[in-house]
Amino acid sequence: STLMRSSAASDVYKRQPVDNDGHIIMDFSMYDAKRAGFEKVVFIIKHEIEEEFKEHVGKRMEKYMDVAYAYQNIDNIPEGYEVPEGRVKPWGTAHAVYSCMDEIDGPFAVINADDYYGVEAFKLIYDYLSTHADDDKYRYTMVGYHLANTVTDNGYVSRGVCETNENGELISVTERTRIEKYNGGVAYTEDDGNTWVQVPDDTTVSMNMWGFTKSILEEIKAGFPAFLDKGLQENASISCQL
């Protein structure tokens, strides 16, 4: 069955409700996913908040979808590797998927727990996964958004700025951790606001909504050790993204 999985869900249940009925953004994502055709959700959480999360979020979702839980533990890395002393930051989205491999039995989507995507995004990704067989062509997909539609009047956001070709194929994603409205447009800074780089409003950006067939699991298992080999030598704060 098609599986949908929610990333970084650990403390989202503490977020402020967005309507008068006490719903949080994740409620809307699950509702939209169900409408699009997804049947199962796997929440990636921390062990220590498991009971609270199930009480505040999981039980509500169980009425509508098949719910499972997985745990992103930074110690869950390939044999022969050690977590750097003092590291508490998770290893990133790819590691979140690595942590729930046993729950994945078909094509699946990956989302952030606290971003709003809209029902059309779930329909697009579900339709793609439903019509593309798992083969050696890497039938993976990402839902992109126009940058101007993803910024806020209240501070800055982090977005993956995408490069695509004329066929709509993704060439690269460059993370910009501080993007905001600036001088009548949108710009990013990498030096705490000393200099700004303007970005066209219609630039395609990633909000970390991905669709994969099961073949990505073997790619993650094969690539994660290489990521650790390179990253641990250079920077103990690295994270492995999809």
Predicted regions and their residues:
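Conserved core of the sugar-phosphate nucleotidyltransferase
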Residues: V119-M209
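Conserved nucleotide-sugar donor-binding
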Residues: M209-E219
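Alpha-helix/helix-capping structural signal
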Residues: E48, A148, K214-S215
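Generic preference for hydrophobic
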Residues: V12-R15, Y69, V173
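Conserved N-terminal catalytic core of the sugar/cofactor nucleotidyltransferase
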Residues: S1, N20-V110, Y117-L124, S130-T131
